Design a protein with these regions (language model features):
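Glycine-rich FAD pyrophosphate-binding loop
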Residues: 15-38
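Glycine-rich active-site loop/strand segments that organize a redox cofactor
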Residues: 38-69
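Active-site substrate-recognition segment that forms the wall
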Residues: 39, 83-91, 175-177, 189-229, ...
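Helical element adjacent to the flavin cofactor pocket in flavoenzyme catalytic cores
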Residues: 106, 113-118, 140-194, 198
Length: 419
């Protein structure tokens, strides 16, 4: 259920390993309608929980294995898409997490220290001369384990590959409810030995699933095509992705056609986990993103913003991604990527396929397998918590911008989210 990255990768890996299987993917809209088709295009090794949090919960070996699997997933996406003939503008140029205040420098140093402690991530502290030339830049943390992609090209390419491998894709088929061996849809009942919930941010729209995941909106803008020489002069080289260490997340990439695609959090959570098309565009947030982009790179002020959009991503109560398979009911689920879903969904789909086929792979032993996140609180507590967290993140950035010091609020946010 769900023709996004998770559902399609699961189907593809099932059919690549067992071509005689009958696999169907059900989708209310079209393949890639959700976050998979409209995200920031970061194929990164980022994972919702930090190495430190993973180690505290699951142990050192498990944390290191999870990090290695995430890093490997970045390269595997490039390799598998090439094998499948999918042109998704995959360019592995790494990501720069810019340092733009003393408070951000403190977090950057902590991130480098954690990477050195767990000895998996190959993070590098760069000087301001060697990174994208953003205002107030004090340098950056460079992570080579990141590629930029065109998300819509990737997800539509996966849909085509899934069908070529023998899968059945049912678009315009709304899932209303599901249970062991059965899925009730707008087109009738589908029956299967295994039922996979790959709905991610849209899970709350299904009967009985409203508290399992919280739909958090992230909005984006894109510029008109910009001369490559202008972007080169800004240090925004082909395929590069960038962010900074603020609390209210922003992210960007130089696209293959020389636009800057730029997004961030800040859009409000809607009472009752509501998801509506009108929430995809919020003028105030899009205007804020435009100001932030041009504040970081004033040269870009001379170029038009031609695209504005957004969408919902899935957040679990403990901010942890998971892959689950109940061997008795044969109900499976994957999600909770908290915006880090391009690579994580690939790893989840690969893992789900192994679990369903009973293959004892290294992925099937990763710590996110059969992790159970608690339910979100009932309303209005869920609304208060989600709105409060967003306000707190923005307030923390304001305090740090004024004082130059890391705020106590930001420490609480990172503790609550496992960062």
């Amino acid at each position: 259920m769900g023709a996004g990255f998770t559902g399609l990768w699961t189907g593809i890996y099932l059919l690549r390993q067992s071509p005689t299987l009958r696999v169907a993917v059900l989708e209310k809209e079209i393949a890639g309608f959700g976050a998979s088709g409209r995200n920031g295009g970061w194929c990164s090794a980022l994972f919702p929980w930090s190495s430190e949090t993973l180690a505290k919960e699951f142990g050192l070996d498990a944390a290191q294995a999870m990090r290695k699997a995430m890093i490997a997933s970045v390269d595997e996406i490039g390799r598998i898409t090439a094998e499948l003939g999918i042109d998704c503008d995959y360019q592995k140029a790494g990501t720069y997490n810019l340092i733009r205040s003393d408070a951000q420098r403190h977090r950057a140093i902590s991130e480098i220290e954690l990477a050195n402690k767990y000895q998996v991530d190959q993070l590098q502290l760069k000087t301001s001369e060697a990174v994208p030339r953003a205002t107030r830049s004090q340098g950056a943390v460079f992570d080579p384990a990141c590629a930029s992609i065109h998300p819509a090209k990737l997800v539509r390419g996966l849909a085509d590959a899934f069908v070529r491998l023998g899968g059945s894709l049912f678009e315009s088929t709304e899932v209303e409810s599901f249970s062991t061996g059965s899925v009730l849809t707008s087109r009738g009942v589908f029956r299967a030995e295994y039922v996979v919930d790959a709905l991610e941010g849209y899970r709350p729209t299904i009967t009985g699933q409203k508290r399992r995941s919280l739909p958090l909106y992230s909005l984006m803008i894109a510029t008109e095509p910009i001369p490559g020489s202008v972007l080169d002069d800004l240090g925004l080289l082909p395929g590069v992705t960038f962010a900074d260490f603020r609390n209210l997340i922003i992210y960007g990439q130089r696209t293959k056609d020389n636009r800057i695609a730029f997004g961030g959090r800040g859009a409000p959570y809607h009472f009752g986990s509501r998801i509506k098309a009108k929430y995809d565009t919020v003028a105030k947030i899009h205007e804020h993103l435009e100001r932030e982009l041009k504040s970081m790179f004033p040269t870009l002020g001379g170029y038009r913003i031609t695209h504005r959009w957004g969408g919902a991503l899935g957040v679990t109560r403990d901010w942890m991604a998971s892959v689950n398979l109940n061997p008795v009911t044969k109900l499976a689920q994957a999600g909770g990527y908290v915006g880090d879903g391009v690579s994580t969904s690939h790893l989840a789909g690969k893992t789900l396929a192994d679990l369903i086929l009973g293959i004892p792979s290294p992925e099937s032993r990763l710590c996110f397998v059969n992790h159970q996140s608690p339910n979100w609180e009932v309303e209005p507590l869920r609304f208060i918590a989600a709105r409060g967290a967003m306000v707190a993140a923005g307030l923390a950035d304001q305090i740090e911008g004024t004082t130059g010091r890391s705020s106590f609020i930001s420490k609480i946010i990172r503790w609550l989210t496992g960062r």
